[in-house]
A protein has these predicted regions:
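Short beta-strand segments
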Residues: 7, 46, 84-88
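Residue-level signal for pocket-adjacent positions within structured domains
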Residues: 24, 50, 120
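Histidine/lysine/aspartate-rich catalytic loop segments that bind and position anionic ligands
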Residues: 29-66
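C-terminal active-site subregion of NodB/CE4 polysaccharide deacetylases
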Residues: 40, 57-158
Length: 158
């Protein structure tokens, strides 16, 4: 089993965190680092848009560009086809899910929403984001109660 890292193709730092949370800038992986990880055989890479946009904040034309161009750039960078896509911030809408399918992805993951059962909906698989955090918060996020809380919290949003 491989770990999956989702690449944002047109940024070289975590702009979304710096701008929204006033966090310190964190450089994203260089091409050399990406290739080293790919060549290790332990890492799979996935698409994650050009600029880490929220699909709630852009129209369909911009969403399609973010998905399609990111896939094209990242596949060229890696020299292989991408199988998996991650919706930035977990934000998705029906039209975006269809775009991801049309781009040829095999499945897509969200954050906080979607099924925890892999075979239920291949384009709405839930994953839990584990950011830089404490051990207590890590344990909280992997507990079943946390997943139930998140499912209730976002039930009507998506």
């Amino acid at each position: 089993m491989k770990a999956v890292i989702f690449l944002v193709s047109e940024l070289d730092y975590d702009r979304w965190t710096v701008e929204s949370d006033n966090e310190k800038r964190f450089d994203l992986m260089s091409d050399e680092e990406v290739m080293e990880l790919q060549n290790s055989g332990h890492i799979e890479f996935g698409g994650h848009t050009l600029t880490h946009v929220s699909f709630f904040d852009v129209d369909d034309e911009r969403a399609r560009e973010e998905i399609e161009k990111d896939k094209e750039i990242t596949e060229k960078r890696l020299g292989k086809k991408l199988k998996v896509f991650a919706y930035p911030y977990g934000h998705k809408r029906k039209e975006v899910v269809e775009m991801v399918k049309e781009c040829g992805y095999s499945f897509a993951v969200s954050t906080d929403t979607g099924s925890g059962i892999f075979t239920k909906d291949l384009f709405d698989i839930r994953r839990t984001a584990i950011d830089k955090t404490s051990l207590i918060n890590f344990l909280r996020r992997i507990s079943p109660r946390y997943l139930q809380y998140k499912a209730r919290k976002y039930k009507d949003k998506f």
